[in-house]
Curated annotation (Swiss-Prot):
Matching Gene3D superfamilies: 2.40.50.100, Cytochrome f large domain, Single helix bin
Family: Belongs to the cytochrome f family.
Function: Component of the cytochrome b6-f complex, which mediates electron transfer between photosystem II (PSII) and photosystem I (PSI), cyclic electron flow around PSI, and state transitions.
Keyword check for Chloroplast: yes
SUPFAM superfamilies in alphabetical order: Cytochrome f subunit of the cytochrome b6f complex, transmembrane anchor (SSF103431), Cytochrome f, large domain (SSF49441), Rudiment single hybrid motif (SSF51246)
Protein name: Cytochrome f
UniProtKB keywords: Chloroplast, Electron transport, Heme, Iron, Membrane, Metal-binding, Photosynthesis, Plastid, Signal, Thylakoid, Transmembrane, Transmembrane helix, Transport
Subcellular locations according to the entry: Plastid, Chloroplast thylakoid membrane
Chief place of localization: plastid
Signal peptide: 1-34
The organism of origin for this protein: Pinus koraiensis (Korean pine)
Lineage, opening ranks: Eukaryota, Viridiplantae, Streptophyta, Embryophyta, Tracheophyta
Source species, domain of life: Eukaryota
């Protein structure tokens, strides 16, 4: 009986711990690491009419990103799209709780219509090894040509390999043998602004009024309440600084409106780029190969004919 009670207690505790772990993962992801989710929730299309990728609305710092794709691909073929997000992996960023931690990365890949993420059974072992344990998803269930990834650890995945399947015009009437553009956006680190317009703790905080700093209160859970004696109306203004940024001002200091109260803790940033890829017609490739073969054969026959002519000339001279 006692063994049975112990078993039931252990079973309940295991369930409780599992639930707590899941809650922690969900809340931590949604607060500090969920930048692809923010874009998916807020925008029908990640690329605006101006060509700007919407991730730049939250990630204000501009950083480089690069994409490598083959110059051309055949229909119904799996190929690699490599997105490179370079940064110093030794850097630490401010997390949502104000502590320092490693940077994570994410990317959105906007392919031409008809191109999509390769199904698992079409991915070769070589490409599978390069993609690692990455989990790719479509931006929308009906937008298979737009793929998002992240957040993932930047120290391990500063180079992301997307396995892509090209369309086949023989079965897809919307696909054509043309040159197509591919767009990519990639970021490292957390954003500075949330989709609702509020600031994260990964950005600089500025004074909302001109006056003297009369009080700086350090909050119990981190962050500051800064009281400013407003010079214009004689009242007081309280600016809230969350945990993370470091103060640049002190009590008694005269400050101006929009003057930075803190440093800028952001270590990351967003970048976007593009590339071109040609969906090549196999018949055109075969035709080109036949043409090249005919040119080579013509050259060989010309050389042989020339040698034969030289032999005839030499024989006539000897007569």
């Amino acid at each position: 009986m006692q063994n049975r009670n112990t078993y039931e207690w252990t079973k309940k505790m295991t369930r409780l711990i599992s639930v707590l772990v899941m809650i922690h993962i969900i809340t931590r992801t949604s607060i500090s690491n969920a930048y692809p989710i923010f874009a998916q929730q807020g925008y029908e299309n990640p690329r605006e009419a101006t060509g700007r990728i919407v991730c730049a609305n939250c990630h204000l710092a501009k950083k480089p990103v690069d994409i490598e794709v083959p110059q051309s691909v055949l229909p119904n073929t799996v190929f690699e799209a490599i997105v490179k997000i370079p940064y110093d992996t030794q850097m630490k960023q401010v997390l949502a709780n104000g502590k320092k931690g490693a940077l994570n990365v994410g990317a959105v890949l906007i392919l031409p219509e008809g191109f999509e993420l390769a199904p698992p059974d079409r991915i070769s072992p070589e490409i599978r090894q390069k993609t690692g344990n990455l989990y790719f998803q479509n931006y929308r269930p009906n937008q298979k040509n737009i793929i998002v990834i992240g957040p993932v650890p930047g120290q391990k995945y500063s180079e992301l390999v997307f396995p892509i399947l090209s369309p086949d015009p023989a079965t897809d009437k919307e696909a054509h043998f043309l040159k197509y553009p591919i767009y990519v956006g990639g970021n490292r680190g957390r954003g500075q602004i949330y989709p609702d317009g509020s600031k994260s703790n990964n950005t600089v905080y500025s004074a909302s009024a001109t006056g003297r700093v009369s009080k700086i209160l350090r909050k119990e859970k981190g962050g500051y309440e800064i009281t400013i004696d407003n010079k214009s109306d004689g009242g007081q203004v309280v600016d809230i600084v969350p945990p993370g940024p470091e103060l640049l001002i002190s009590e008694g200091e005269l400050i101006k409106v929009d003057q930075p109260l803190t440093n800028n803790p952001n270590m990351g940033g967003f970048g976007q780029g593009d590339a071109e890829i040609v969906l090549q017609d196999p018949l055109r490739v075969k035709g080109l190969l036949l043409f090249l073969a005919s040119v080579i054969l013509a050259q060989i026959f010309l050389v042989l004919k020339k040698k034969q002519f030289e032999k005839v000339q030499l024989a006539e001279m000897n007569l």
